[in-house]
Amino acid sequence: MALPGSLNRYLLLMAQEHLEFRLPEIKSLLSVIGGQFTNSQETYGKSPFWILNIPSEDIARNLMKRTVCAKSIFELWGHGKSPEELYTSLKSYPVEKMVPYLHSDSTYKIKIHTFNKTLTQEEKVKRIDALEFLPFQGKVNLKKPQHVFSILEDYGLDPNSIPKDPHNIYFGRWIADGQRELIESYSVKKRHFIGNTSMDAGLSFIMTNHAKVKENDLVFDPFVGTGGLLIASAHFGAYVCGTDIDYNTVHGLGKASRKNQKWRGPDENIRANLRQYGLEKFYLDVLVSDASKPSWRKGTYFDAIITDPPYGIRESTRRSGSQKDIPKGIEKCPESHVPVSLSYHLSDMFFDLLNFAAETLVLGGRLVYWLPVYTPEYTEEMVPWHPCLRLISNCEQKLSSHTARRLITMEKVKEFENRDKYSHLLSDHFLPYQGHNSFREKYFSGVTKRIAKEEKCSHE
């Protein structure tokens, strides 16, 4: 089948974790780097092998400079469901596209990658020898080759039922690897300043990619905590800032979250985290502030808002306020005063967040946030809605047998008007989502039932 325009076929080798997050990440990144998402497969599902149509090798390389969901990308020369189909496909690949990488002055090596099966060395050599019909003119160099070619075999997803023959076989020229090493180099275990709910490094980079963060963007986190999401954005050259209602967290005070450490040190703060990774120049500031009462002037400031609001499980949901009938006026409080706080219903928190994003994001800017859900009752109608924001993706991460959190990505498609502020009250999504006010109770009721069941089994 002829490809549209000047598109070339590439094979993506995907990582087998966070499966739902992979497609939105690739789509978002392609739109950032000037590509357009078109595919030659109807669905990707859980397979680690994706075939993409991409305009140029430069775009393929730029994609791999950002993605943490993909391991490698290859220029696809041929594929089939059997060795014979693969060889037929390779023989039909234009020779003029092969020659630049196979001439006599070049060096190369051929690698074998199998998914869900291990081959013996003898089997690997047999597969490589079968490619002798390709016009390789260069010399083999296993240590520092100019060009690397790969045979990739897919034996399905079931480790308990591995077929004798692969479902699909691919052959291509290696182009580049993804950024999987960032997950280790930015690991929370190695981070100077952490909290109880510091975001996993891999998920932080996925959120940043879903938000289409790019160099010189302004990124904001209204529930900043220890700033893990800011670090991922700063890595890609964005300027970062945030707010949090917790004075101790913002200033790096109070009890430490690390084992065998009682109190936080004098230099444990968000700025020190960015300094640790050489990213301090991208740090603007972090403020003690209440997300339910934004203190920003009217206007569109942010290219992206990326956040992980508290769910009331490991961190409390709070807003400033008082139970008294006549709370003390803020104008009477000294500058150093930290207001008392009230509980902050989850539904109110998320609708406040959407309103804030609609008011302060630039047109085309993205809001990326986590939404906790009680799985037995979840429906798509529960995802908060706003007339200025369009839902881009909704990806699930399971937390337990009965709870999950969903990574919601929204894009601003319309300028904010005052009448939009309370439009959610008229939405069909409002009443279903109010049930999330009891997410904490449902979470702990599930935990209690599980513990009781385990205790009952242990006594039988």
Swiss-Prot record:
EC number annotated for this UniProt entry: 2.1.1.214
Subcellular location, record wording: Cytoplasm
UniProt-listed InterPro entries: DNA_methylase_N6_adenine_CS (IPR002052), RlmKL-like_Mtase (IPR000241), SAM-dependent_MTases_sf (IPR029063), tRNA_mtfrase_TRM11 (IPR016691)
Pfam families: UPF0020
Reactions catalysed: guanosine(10) in tRNA + S-adenosyl-L-methionine = N(2)-methylguanosine(10) in tRNA + S-adenosyl-L-homocysteine + H(+)
Keywords for this protein: Acetylation, Cytoplasm, Methyltransferase, RNA-binding, S-adenosyl-L-methionine, Transferase, tRNA processing, tRNA-binding
The keyword tRNA processing is assigned to this record: yes
Residues the record lists as N-acetylalanine modifications: 2
GO CC terms: cytoplasm; tRNA (m2G10) methyltransferase complex
Keyword Glycoprotein: no
GO terms, biological process: methylation; tRNA processing
Single GO MF descriptor: tRNA (guanine(10)-N2)-methyltransferase activity
Description of how the protein assembles with itself and partners: Part of the heterodimeric TRMT11-TRM112 methyltransferase complex; this complex forms an active tRNA methyltransferase, where TRMT112 acts as an activator of the catalytic subunit TRMT11.
Function, as annotated: Catalytic subunit of the TRMT11-TRM112 methyltransferase complex, that specifically mediates the S-adenosyl-L-methionine-dependent N(2)-methylation of guanosine nucleotide at position 10 (m2G10) in tRNAs. This is one of the major tRNA (guanine-N(2))-methyltransferases.
Family designation: Belongs to the class I-like SAM-binding methyltransferase superfamily. TRM11 methyltransferase family.
Protein name: tRNA (guanine(10)-N(2))-methyltransferase TRMT11
Annotated organism of origin: Mus musculus
Gene: Trmt11
